[in-house]
Amino acid sequence: TNYPPYNIIKTEENWYELQLAIAGFKDDDLNIEIRDSVLSVKGNKSEEDTNDYIHKGISARSFHRTFTLADTIVVRAADLKDGILTIELENVIPEEKKPRKIAIGGDKTLLTE
C-alpha cells in the first residue's frame, strides 16, 4: 500500500527525518515500534465518526506502514504536528567502520615476536 505518503529527508550528516502525512490522527491513534531493524508505524482512529457528510474526501482510514532500517540506524524521537508525523533517525557508525585516512610514507611499526 502507498498510504500514508512519506518523505525521507537528510537533515544533517548521519541524521534523517521520516515524515508521514497522517492528517486527522492524534498521538493516541498511533503505535510506533521497532523490532529487528524494522520500523513499524500503525494508525487506528480511536473515535467513531458520527458526522453526516455531504462529501468526504479526507481519508481517515487505518494504516500500517513498515520500513526496513540499516543495522546502524537508531530511532531517536517522534513528533506529530500539523498532520505530519516526524520520526528522527540517526546513523550511528561504529568507530571500526568509519573511514580513516592512511598516510603514505608514514611511520612504520615492525611486528616482532
State what each model feature region is.
Residues T1-E113:
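Alpha-crystallin/small heat shock protein
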